[in-house]
Design a protein with these regions (language model features):
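Short acidic/polar inter-strand loop motif in beta-rich domains
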Residues: 334, 374-388
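Amphipathic alpha-helical substructures
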Residues: 78-80, 206-301
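Active-site-adjacent structural elements in folded domains
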Residues: 88-91, 118-123, 143-144, 195-205, ...
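Hydrophobic helix-coil surface modules that form long, contiguous segments used
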Residues: 1-129, 159
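Active-site His/Glu-centered metal-binding helix of metallohydrolases
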Residues: 128, 132-137, 156, 160
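Acidic/His/Gly-enriched intrinsically disordered linker/tail segments
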Residues: 150-219, 223, 240-245
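Beta-strand-rich binding/interaction modules
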Residues: 229, 263-267, 279-352, 357-374
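Catalytic Zn2+-binding segment of zinc metalloproteases
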Residues: 132-148, 168
């Protein structure tokens, strides 16, 4: 809320805050000798409270808040406060957390982060966008206390942050974010103490609702359409905004995605990503290029593809893969710092089936690299073999 009084009573300082909007009984208190950076944006006062000398990323955070608010208000509805605050706290812990219009943010993951190297993930912007989105998913819409509840909180914030990153960095630079999330999910699966659950039944398992959730949501919006997904999510927010029981649950979200599926292939994809534990094994090999008589280049790529279903203890069985998956041709390897959309020669979906198959593509430019699912949108057990240099 807004500070309405600040007095000293005896030896105690007393500050009183009042919110004009409904909030949860869920808040935090930070008090320090802060510097404050402010910016006005669309009727909202953006504020960063930081330790003097820790201004390295303050402007980046303010820029991220602006970009996130613009995206969320355009697609999800009005932001409920006339302020948004980020408050630095010491690096005794490395997290940020969203309270009502107020985000405590560890110095170690934001304020003293080094983002100078283009090869690094801009996690300052990523985390800022994620936490600001919780003003919608957690503070406007509250999920029921049952399996799958964090899908409506953390997975939605991951999705929203990725959409902001896509808008800022472009579709062709999103691979580094997706690969980071994918690799973290895959490595964490082996440390599961009880049972891995499908996303729709996740039980506060961070590697599922954060890491897997980010990759799953990105693929769903890619296949079903970002605008269509956002329209469905906005409808869900409208239905439950600031309401008490009965609260939203994972069935609302899964049903929403299923309603967007236009054919059997898309329905199968929704089931695979949300209701099952599904793993893919996609590999590119033997990419050979020859110059044609008309000056164009013919690229022939060998693709190996498989799909597996796993149970909660990691036992796998093969499943039939029948999908349309992107094949990309590039002048530079995707994911590197210098890579951008100018390095993309061709990016199209092709029918992919279980097993080995050859795909032939003709382009005007000679590719240096070819890959299947080159931006790591699928839960691929080994994403390092998706891209291969041409011969």
């Amino acid at each position: 809320g807004r500070r309405v009084s600040d007095t000293v009573e005896g030896d105690r300082r007393v500050a009183r805050f009042v919110s004009k909007q409904p909030i949860l009984g869920f808040f935090s208190v930070q008090s320090a000798a802060y510097e404050v950076a402010r910016r006005q944006h669309g009727g909202v006062t953006l504020e960063i409270y930081y330790n003097p000398g820790h201004d390295f990323n303050v402007e980046r955070m303010l820029d991220a808040m602006e970009a996130a608010l613009d995206y969320y208000q355009a697609h999800f509805g009005p932001y409920q406060f006339d302020y948004a605050r980020i408050i630095e706290f010491p690096g005794y812990a490395s997290f940020a957390q969203a309270f009502a219009g107020t985000i405590p943010f560890s110095e170690s993951i934001g304020f003293i982060a080094d983002n100078a190297d283009a090869e690094n993930i801009d996690y300052v912007t990523y985390v800022t966008a994620h936490e600001l989105d919780h003003q919608y998913w957690a503070h406007q819409l509250i999920s029921s206390d049952q399996q799958g509840s964090t899908m409506l909180v953390e997975t939605m914030a991951q999705y929203s942050a990725l959409m902001v990153m896509k808008q800022l960095y472009g579709e062709d630079n999103i691979r580094r974010f997706l690969k980071y999330e994918l690799d973290n999910y895959l490595s964490a699966r082996g440390s599961e103490a009880i049972e891995e659950l499908p996303l729709e039944r996740v039980e506060n398992q961070g590697y599922i609702h954060y890491r897997k959730g980010a990759v799953v949501m990105y693929l769903l919006q890619d296949r079903l359409g970002e605008d269509r997904v956002n329209e469905m999510l906005a409808g869900l927010l409208d239905k439950y905004r600031f309401k008490g029981a009965p609260y939203a649950n994972a069935n609302d979200l899964v049903g929403g995605f299923m309603s967007l599926a236009r054919n059997e292939s898309e329905r199968e994809l929704v089931n695979d990503l949300l209701k099952r534990i599904t793993l893919y094994d996609l590999k590119a090999d033997n990419a050979k290029v020859r110059k044609l008589a008309d000056g164009r280049f013919e690229t022939r790529i060998e693709v190996e593809a498989d799909k597996f279903y796993a149970d909660g203890e990691g036992r796998e069985r093969k499943a039939l893969l029948k999908d349309s998956i992107e094949i990309g041709l590039f002048t530079q390897k995707p994911g590197l710092g210098a890579f951008d959309k100018g390095d993309v020669i061709s990016m199209k979906r092709y029918p992919i089936r279980s097993g080995s198959q050859d795909i032939t593509i003709v382009t005007k430019t000679r590719p240096a690299f070819v890959g299947i699912d080159p931006y790591n949108k699928y839960i691929d057990r080994n994403s390092d073999d998706n891209i291969v240099a041409t011969e």
